[in-house]
Design a protein with these regions (language model features):
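A short acidic-Thr-Gly-centered motif at the start of a beta-strand
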Residues: 1-15, 97-100, 147, 276-305, ...
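Two-metal-ion RNase H-like nuclease active-site motif
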Residues: 14-25, 305-307
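Acidic, Mg2+-coordinating catalytic module of metal-dependent nucleases/exonucleases
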Residues: 165-255, 570, 590
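Conserved DEDDh/DEDDy metal-dependent 3′-5′ exonuclease domain
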Residues: 59-190, 198-201, 205
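Short beta-strand
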Residues: 135, 583-588
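C-terminal, non-catalytic extensions of nucleic-acid polymerases
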Residues: 214-296, 328, 373-374, 381, ...
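Short active-site loop/helix that positions an aromatic residue
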Residues: 115-124, 211, 310-327, 598
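Cytochrome P450 catalytic domain signature, combining two hallmark sequence patches
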Residues: 124-136, 173-180, 214-221, 320-337, ...
Length: 809
């Protein structure tokens, strides 16, 4: 937001509102009696709960008094009152808002859903002159002001609290109620008491959760009232870090902001774009040897183990000296010949160091016998082209994302071969990358040649500033203290865990984003960012630089480096396991599932030694020793205790363990590709299927009981390639937006010949889900493996639930 509008995002209110709607899918016919193909979602009930702002600092489930407008109830002076109002249409709610005397903050859990109805009901769109409206996307409204509802600032409580109503209710001991979702109710139908109770309960849970946040989390960022609560959990973490830094490191904090603002290339659009194009998220991939064969899935019984890194991103943030791209020490190389010589020299230098696990390499490169820099190169970004690149071991897990690359114009000549979206081989492959990504490629791939048409490198490196190192150490210390049964409150543990989970996300937030507005009852992109050749990029980037010039604490390229370095750590462990005679089966960001061939204890011992080296190298670093010392002195904490807990950071821990924590293989495991696997741990089935409900694990367990068969047999029958889970059991929904003209909707009638009382919004409907292997993966397996039978691809089955009975057809 621009400086002139810095206070646009603060509404000072006397009361706080909580709003929720209940909807049905109503079938309508037109004036000639023809029924519309699709139903229109209609509000049949909505609830508003109002409470005095100051009450939120003290209210809880035991001292709240809910007073409904339609009931006579005496005031209990020992409790905090909130007032509950019900409406049968949105029009009634909007009229109610006009009776509010002051600007009112109104929390809505998952605001985007209610917002889709509100913008259809109103006519004049957003008030973006006087207030700041915040969107994360066209389907993700975080905060809004509507011209036709001038007294209300809508906020999304889900963005701040990060949990569903059910999770929040369970957490505070005030559970969500149940209701029959299959009923289709109209705004004129008589409702049961449970309908009102259900609608109201969701708002009360949100109210109590916001109150809990205000009482237990907000004080850590110096906030005492709801007006100034952050909009998102990420903003809360940034504020918490800011308060910590200003309290314990005021001078360094201010100096860091000045340095980043005046010195960093982060305000250069070209640098931002190459760093963004080099970004690599978590590596999610699998081994093609473990995909389905002609007997079904390639199931593993009691033979695979699972390890993951303890706080992978936080480890990188603490352990790494980041290449620092300052205006003084950064050098652009635009000449293709020089850039190519440079990238070849760097690749050779990096490869020399890959066997030395923790080496912080710096590489001295000469061109035509002349040294190109006064110091070693500490890092680079480059756009490169690999010639005849291929996976070193065809049966390894590939690690180059195909979506982040391009091939020659003649795609047939490029002979790009992919598996689960990852590159296996290509005649010619172009991509943007940094030094950490190049190192990972050198571990996994061979290539005949490499060319470079652009590079920017730096001879400077820095660890994160001490205020941030100490903040991370402190949050990790709190988190591990709770896990190790130290004297730590669960609320403090949850706070610390939330902070650690958000710290990486803070670093990689896009600097330029689409501009979003509302037009004709629809959320649209008014200015698009990031598309190729888009003139808006420069305009939006300049706005970002101007608006953030006084508050620069994070460097985007650091976030890119954190992600690629964490990915590199995964690739290095994958390499280590292969050298110890293991097959890596599946990996996801910070974890590896592998099968051992040979001496299991020898593999476990090698992982222990690997971990010991990680710990030694971490605690040996001068900036870590100093950060621990500073943190312990400022926070009055025992230094040995901090070191002991910090010694687990970045180490590989076993996920496959028994009830007592002893290492054991999974009961069974199978994968159909990235984010598609089924495992059983200690008799409990778990499934991860991107886009599909976790309920599939329950479905497998229920089917085993129903058919009186083992969990393994049930899993093999249900978790199969080309299986369709229909709408009765998938848990999958699709969202479509009402687009019918308002004047046309005014002419419609329902089955009782009653008119519509609302113009619709997001229509959410249950749908089926097909569990299958990616098409490029099918083709590859077909061509490479004789055992991959064609019938395995063509035959399918459908799983459904009818009257409580699971059926497989």
């Amino acid at each position: 937001m621009s400086n002139k509008n810095k206070n646009k995002n603060i509404v000072y209110s006397d009361e706080v509102a909580f709003f929720d709607i209940e909807t049905s899918k109503i079938k309508y016919h037109d004036e000639e009696g023809f029924e519309l193909k699709n139903p229109i979602p209609q509000v049949y009930l909505c609830n508003v709960v109002l409470i005095k702002k100051e009450y939120l600092n003290n209210v809880n489930k035991d001292n709240i008094q809910i007073i409904r407008e339609d009931k006579q109830e005496e005031i209990d002076d020992t409790k905090y009152q909130c007032y509950s109002y019900f409406f049968r249409t949105l029009e009634e709610f909007i009229n109610f808002t006009k009776t509010l005397k002051n600007k009112t903050i109104c929390y809505v859990h998952n605001l985007s859903y209610e917002f889709s109805f509100l913008i259809r009901e109103t006519n004049n769109g957003l008030d973006d002159i006087n207030y700041q409206n915040i969107f994360r996307g066209t389907n993700d409204c975080l905060k809004s002001f509507l011209n036709d509802i001038p007294n209300v600032e809508f906020r999304d409580s889900l963005a701040l609290l990060g949990k569903s109503i059910k999770e929040l209710g369970d957490e505070i001991g005030y559970p969500k109620l149940e209701i029959d979702y299959e009923r289709n109710l109209h705004y004129y139908d008589e409702l049961e008491d449970n309908d009102y109770d259900y609608n109201e309960r969701d708002n009360i849970i949100t109210l109590l959760s916001i109150a809990d946040f205000l009482q237990h989390k907000a004080p850590s960022i110096g906030i005492k009232n709801v007006d100034k609560l952050p909009i998102t959990s990420t903003r809360y973490v940034k504020n918490k870090r800011y308060k910590f830094a200003k309290k314990y490191f005021p001078k360094e904090f201010d100096e860091t902001a000045v340095d980043y603002r005046n010195d960093s290339l982060d305000d250069n659009l070209d640098f931002y774009e190459i760093s963004k194009n080099s970004f690599r998220g978590g590596l999610v991939s699998c081994n093609k040897l473990y995909m389905p064969n002609d007997n079904g899935n390639n199931w593993l019984e009691n033979s695979c183990y699972h390890i993951d890194i303890t706080s992978s991103y936080i480890y990188v943030m603490l352990n790494t000296k980041f290449p620092y791209y300052s205006k003084e020490k950064s050098v652009e190389v635009k000449d293709k010949n020089k850039a190519t010589i440079l990238i070849k020299s760097l690749a050779e230098g990096i490869e020399k160091y890959t066997s030395n696990y923790m080496n912080e390499y710096g590489i001295n490169v000469k061109i035509d016998g002349k040294k190109i820099a006064d110091e070693d190169i500490k890092g680079f970004y480059a756009h490169v082209t690999f010639k005849n690149i291929r996976l070193k071991n065809k049966n390894d897990i590939p690690s180059i994302d195909g979506a982040r690359t391009s091939v020659a114009d003649d795609k047939n000549s490029a002979k790009l071969k992919r598996f689960c979206g990852k590159v296996l081989e290509a005649d010619e492959l172009s991509m943007s990358l940094n030094d950490a990504t190049l190192e990972a490629i050198l571990i996994d791939y061979d290539f005949d040649d490499i060319e470079c048409d652009y590079m920017i490198y730096t001879t400077e490196s820095k660890q994160l500033p001490y205020f941030e190192l100490c903040f991370l150490i402190g949050e990790f210390f709190i988190k591990q203290s709770f896990k190790n049964n130290k004297n730590t409150k669960r609320s403090d543990y949850l706070l610390a865990k939330s902070c650690l989970n958000s710290m990486f996300g803070i670093k990689v937030q896009d600097l330029i984003k689409d501009k979003i507005t509302v037009k004709n009852g629809e959320v649209i992109v008014s200015e698009k960012a990031h598309s190729i050749g888009n003139d808006n990029n420069k305009k939006l980037f300049d706005e970002y630089v101007e608006n953030n010039k006084d508050n620069k604490q994070d460097i985007y390229s650091d976030g890119v480096y954190i992600a690629t370095k964490a990915r590199l750590n995964l690739v290095k462990m994958k390499k280590h396991l292969k050298e110890k005679g293991c097959n890596c089966i599946y990996c996801d960001t910070d974890s590896l599932i592998f099968e051992v061939f040979g001496d299991v204890e020898e593999v476990f011992n090698s992982i222990k030694k690997y971990n010991d080296k990680i710990t030694r190298e971490l605690l040996r670093k001068n900036w870590i020793k100093r950060a621990i010392k500073i943190y312990c002195e400022k926070l009055k904490v025992d230094e040995k205790e901090v070191k002991d807990l910090l010694s687990t950071l970045g180490t590989w821990d076993y996920e496959s363990v028994d009830e007592n924590g002893n290492i054991k293989p999974y009961d069974f495991f199978s994968t159909l590709g990235p984010k598609k696997y089924c495992k059983c741990k200690n008799g409990k089935v778990e499934t991860t299927i991107s886009g599909l409900s976790k309920k599939i694990a329950n479905l497998i367990e229920d089917y085993a009981k129903q058919e009186n068969i083992s969990l393994f047999e049930a899993a093999k029958l249900i978790f199969k390639n080309n299986t369709t889970f229909d709408e009765t059991c998938s848990g999958q929904t699709i969202v479509t937006q009402t687009t019918l003209d308002k004047k046309f909707i005014d002419t419609l009638r329902d089955e009782n010949n009653m008119p519509a009382k609302g113009y619709g919004g997001n229509l959410i409907e249950k749908t089926s889900f097909n569990l299958s292997i990616l098409s490029d993966t099918e083709s590859l397996l077909h061509s490479e493996f004789e055992f991959f039978a064609e019938k395995n691809m063509l035959t399918g089955q459908t799983v459904s639930i009818e009257k409580g009975i699971i059926k497989i057809i």
